A protein has these predicted regions:
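Asp-based, Mg2+/Mn2+-dependent phosphohydrolase catalytic module
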Residues: 1-169
Length: 169
């Protein structure tokens, strides 16, 4: 099928038809529905898992909870690199199984970022990679290192580094 319009497109069509803006929207990424879910579940440490940056991850950001981006749906590595701050997930994984694995931690060392066996650094405004890139997990480690750099400096060229992550959408 490819990408299809979500509820936001339907709400926008309704807004245009009636010529008014709703006072409150109870859908992602807006807080009411998410906050009500957290309250009803009495969640102490909720994590929002999703594949869309503009609804799932931004929704988590809007209610102040952690988010976990999976790569089995709508958005991929390039979307993540180019995400605006309120769409930055707090963690990433290939799918739901990633929730059971240790969380990816990125650490800065001078002008480079390390994540497990991956190293991302900048040379001449271009993001470069070192480390193994054979498995999906190794590529996710590298991606997590890359986004730390690009989220700090949006002018960096990460195209070649992203191309090396050939198992990620």
């Amino acid at each position: 099928l490819g990408l299809v319009p979500g509820a936001g497109a339907q709400i926008e069509a309704l807004r245009t038809a009636v010529g008014d803006t709703p006072i409150t929207v109870a859908g992602k990424p807006y807080p009411p529905l998410l906050q009500e879910t957290i309250n009803r579940m009495q969640a102490r440490r909720p994590v929002f898992v999703g594949d869309r940056l503009d609804t799932d991850i931004e929704g988590a950001h809007n209610v102040g909870i952690d988010s976990f981006m999976v790569f089995t749906g709508a958005h991929g590595k390039t979307d993540l690199v180019n995400a605006i701050p309120q769409q930055h997930p707090t963690a990433i994984g290939w799918n739901l199984r990633g929730l059971l694995a240790p969380r990816r931690e990125a650490s800065w060392h001078d002008d480079e970022v390390l994540c497990r066996g991956a190293r991302a650094y900048v040379y001449g405004g271009v993001v470069r990679l070192d480390g193994p890139l054979i498995t999906v997990d190794e590529q996710l480690d590298a991606l997590w290192a890359i986004v730390q750099l690009t989220w700090r400096d949006g002018s960096l060229d990460a195209a070649d580094a992203l191309d090396a992550l050939d198992q990620l959408p």
